[in-house]
């Protein structure tokens, strides 16, 4: 009987469940979108129960459509939108408030207050993160401070906190297992990434009781089994967990120090494996845990670019210059260059390495000769320039030269963008045959834990190249173009809202 691994890819706008076979091939996919809640400007929330419902719905449809029985599933892996925080009552088994999403800015005042107390350096030193609403810790504090009766319940030990992976494992296991993995714990602002434990001092600053927190476990391990009522009585091992970007790093087989991947989604997230050493960034990067497996942990440097694929959506929906995302490539290749035009898509500020939340988008270099094609090309090029910003910071911090960049996500289908990316980095760009690297990474972690795959070497050998883009641009042109980008970013930062 052929066996499979089932991967839950719980994202920001939808949940997907994907079934993989031994060769890492996709045998079935099911996807469900869910509601985005915006209670106030800058706030983003999800209904955690609705997310759970989408998971169950995807389970049912993917098994039915792929004609796979529950007893053929060897294990379940989970990858998730990181930082999004859920607080639930362990007695009623229900969330006490909506999940506060990673994008939500509703805890800015809490962050400002902690900064005013001079605590930013301590948080940075222990967690590798910035004091920013992006991360989970201040979201948990906000819920305890703002939901009636929450703090009292928390002090009495009745409330549990988890990132989305924790919530799903708890529900899948019939409310038995309250766990998370190293990669997700490292995004909470409450976990000491050097000592590998929840940090009592940071919890005190955030006024979060330790009793709420999940047990932190390796990313590849059997955490428990599914409850009898989920898969017609079949108890399936829940065996792999990683935050979405770390799962993509694993799915891209970036197991060695210096290996890096860039995911081109709504934004771009670039991670470089730094091995068993946590590298402190002096250049605006985050230090994070990549994964824990085989009794040890790997660290990573991470750069966040806020606007990537969403810039292409903006060309389509906001500027109405294109009718579909693939059309951007056609227009970009109709001209030989951007004719001196630079688009800085700082629609929600600038991420790594600038961390300038006040910056706003700008366009430079327009002349009477500027055409729509130049504007579209310059927008695509901005994704590559921002990636260069991050890669340069990574090489400075790690003292490691990146030899190749592995890529995944929706925008990597754009051959023009991938070639320009290689040119502006002066590094080969590798696009894999299987683009679903996030879900695949979670599947690999689960499969290793249950013996479905034997080793990381076996997984590395299963990684297949679809296309490699080699740099073709001469150094003078490359550096001139990049210098223009740096000038444009500086000018953008001068013009504040």
Curated annotation (Swiss-Prot):
InterPro entries: ATPase_NBD (IPR043129), Carb_kinase_FGGY (IPR000577), Carb_kinase_FGGY_CS (IPR018483), FGGY_C (IPR018485), FGGY_N (IPR018484), Glycerol_kin (IPR005999). Activated by phosphorylation and inhibited by fructose 1,6-bisphosphate (FBP). Pathway: Polyol metabolism; glycerol degradation via glycerol kinase pathway; sn-glycerol 3-phosphate from glycerol: step 1/1. GO terms for biological process: glycerol catabolic process; glycerol metabolic process; glycerol-3-phosphate metabolic process. The keyword Transferase applies. The modification Phosphohistidine is found at residue 230. SUPFAM superfamilies: Actin-like ATPase domain. Sn-glycerol 3-phosphate binds at residues 12, 82-83, 134, 244. Glycerol binds at residues 82-83, 134, 244-245. It is an enzyme of class 2 (transferase). Coiled coil: none annotated. The phosphoenolpyruvate-dependent sugar phosphotransferase system (PTS), including enzyme I, and histidine-containing protein (HPr) are required for the phosphorylation, which leads to the activation of the enzyme. Homotetramer and homodimer (in equilibrium). This is Glycerol kinase. It comes from Macrococcus caseolyticus (strain JCSC5402). The gene is glpK.
